[in-house]
Amino acid sequence: MTTRDGVQDSWGGPAGQQPHDKTYFLNLLGDSHTGLGRHEAAIEAYRQAAEGFKSQGAHCSYALCLWKVAESHLSLGEPWHALGYLQASLPLLHELGLTRHEGLAREQLAQCRSELTGVH
């Protein structure tokens, strides 16, 4: 996707925007918490980052944050929470052409549905 000006930076946000804003750091904080196995803290950081990216029009970063929230819920063994985030991220990942993440999200969504219905 492109911005109103038709230019995008490497983070999926409007070009010329400082990547070192609060939203950017919340995303990095979520990544750090994930790396340390602190998935609940990661979820909170990613959710806040997703809100910021959405308001900034950074569609790629927004979609990836939604997916990261789902990943964190799956790491906690909470497929019922991951389900909604996967469903929200899938159309965005598809639209943005993020095929690798879209494929992962589809697999995770199928796994969530399987776990929730008791069919393995």
Predicted regions and their residues:
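TPR/TPR-like (Sel1-like) alpha-helical repeat modules
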Residues: 79-97, 110
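Short coil/turn linkers that connect adjacent helices within long alpha-helical scaffolds
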Residues: 12-19, 52-60, 92-100
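Hydrophobic/aromatic packing residues within the alpha-helices of TPR/SEL1-like helical repeat arrays
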Residues: 7-10, 46, 53, 86, ...
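Single-residue signature of alpha-solenoid repeat helices
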Residues: 3-6, 42, 82
